């Protein structure tokens, strides 16, 4: 008899504990939260690119930046090889991927204009400049 009462109490405690379990402390993502995270990542990327400089030892480059809902990039980010280009390219790839997911998830629309890449790059006052 004592054994069945003990089991009953144990089961009751078990059910009580799980019925009062707290929800996760992680708030759900909202469109605004995701937009803020994308904006912060974009700022990091632009700041890194803006620290680059050009000269005889460094080459100017550009990379497709952003993900338009219709496809293609929003524009092109100009930078030089004076910075950690692998780090920059990885961040841009991540940003482009996350923005594409954001666009799909939240039903974002835009014009479907195609942004052409630069036709060449110039080094002016130690800064890379795109020529369109």
Predicted segment positions?
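Sec-dependent bacterial lipoprotein signal peptides
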Residues: 1-19
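Bacterial Sec-dependent N-terminal signal peptides
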Residues: 16-39
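First exposed extracellular module after export/assembly in secreted or surface-exposed proteins
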Residues: 2-3, 31-132
């Amino acid at each position: 008899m004592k054994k069945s009462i003990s089991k009953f109490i144990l089961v009751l405690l078990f059910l009580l504990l799980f019925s009062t379990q707290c929800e996760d402390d992680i708030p759900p993502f909202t469109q605004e939260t995701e937009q803020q995270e994308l904006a912060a990542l974009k700022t990091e990327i632009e700041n890194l690119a803006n620290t680059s400089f050009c000269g005889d030892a460094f080459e100017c480059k550009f990379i497709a930046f952003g993900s338009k809902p219709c496809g293609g990039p929003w524009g092109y980010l100009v930078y030089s090889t004076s910075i950690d280009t692998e780090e920059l390219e990885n961040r841009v790839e991540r940003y482009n991927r996350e923005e594409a997911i954001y666009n799909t998830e939240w039903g974002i629309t835009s014009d479907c204009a195609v942004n052409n890449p630069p036709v060449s790059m110039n080094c002016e006052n130690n800064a890379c400049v795109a020529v369109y």
